[in-house]
Amino acid sequence: MEMTNAQRLILSNQYKMMTMLDPDNAERYRRLQTIIERGYGLQMRELDREFGELTEEVCRTIINVMEMHHALQVSWTNLKDKQDLDERRLTFLGFDAATEARYLGFVRFMVHVEGRYPHFDAGTHGFNAQTKMWEKYTRMLAVWQSCPRQYHLSAVEIAQIINA
């Protein structure tokens, strides 16, 4: 992240104020203030992640993934014959914090701030799947979107989606 000295000074002052306004996170803000003031390039890359951007298309895809998981859970609940389907495989795991942090942040925003999908279990890791999920979810989405009745899935359709 490239910043002028004036921009670094402004951001440093913002972090200084945040240490006073949010004492619970003061250490984090002091650390960021030091990084900005001293211009540590490697650590300043962390800010790139915090100030990242997700396109509208990516946001819609993530919402579709979450909606697909909702549909899987609804369909499973309505099934009379569950045919050895393991309910745990229908759980929305989230995204990998290490490689898909922006996607994970959007999921947390949707659930905790926007109040969408409150029935999703964040688990002990807060939707951190701890493995890359984007490609898996896009394969699952392709199968789900080809189903004629997306919220009334059969056991076979559910199995096809989760095995995609």
From Swiss-Prot:
InterPro entries the record matches: UPF0304_YfbU, YfbU_alpha-helical_sf, YfbU_helix-hairpin_sf
One Pfam family in the UniProt entry: YfbU
SUPFAM superfamilies in UniProt: YfbU-like
Family listed: Belongs to the UPF0304 family.
Protein name, per record: UPF0304 protein ECA3037
